[in-house]
Curated annotation (Swiss-Prot):
Signal peptide: none annotated. Residues 1-101 form the SSB domain. The lineage of its organism: Bacteria, Pseudomonadati, Pseudomonadota, Gammaproteobacteria, Alteromonadales. PROSITE patterns: SSB. It comes from Shewanella baltica (strain OS155 / ATCC BAA-1091). HAMAP family: PriB (MF_00720). Keywords: DNA replication, DNA-binding, Primosome. Pfam families: SSB_1. One of its GO terms (biological process) is DNA replication, synthesis of primer. Belongs to the PriB family. This is Replication restart protein PriB.
């Protein structure tokens, strides 16, 4: 088995909730991450915007709190998702979320 695990913190910029035709609750957030990291002994600004998908009953208790401006830390795995326009994009499927504010 190969490793695919990511922990990322940031601020929610957009969120939406819906239920699938099978009745599964989903929350989709856009997470904005800003930080500074050292690379090759130089400080580098890091900026990422990535979609995070939270699916199933384990996230229903926090779903109402996942609004723009809220800081969170998510842990999950990355995968490609094909958009309606046919373009592939990298997304995170959350396995855990922690509210920071």
């Amino acid at each position: 088995m190969t490793t695919n695990n990511l922990v990322l913190s940031g601020t929610i910029t957009r969120s939406r909730r819906f239920k699938s035709p099978a009745g599964i609750a989903h929350s989709v957030i856009m997470l904005e991450h800003k930080s500074q990291r050292y690379e090759a002994d130089m400080l580098r600004n890091v900026y990422v915007q990535i979609q995070v998908i939270l699916s199933g009953p384990r996230f229903e208790s926090v779903a109402e709190d996942l609004k723009a401006g809220v800081e969170v830390q998510v842990q999950g795995f990355m995968t490609l998702q094909q958009g309606r326009n046919g373009q592939n994009r990298l997304v995170i499927h959350a396995e855990n979320v922690e509210l920071k504010t």
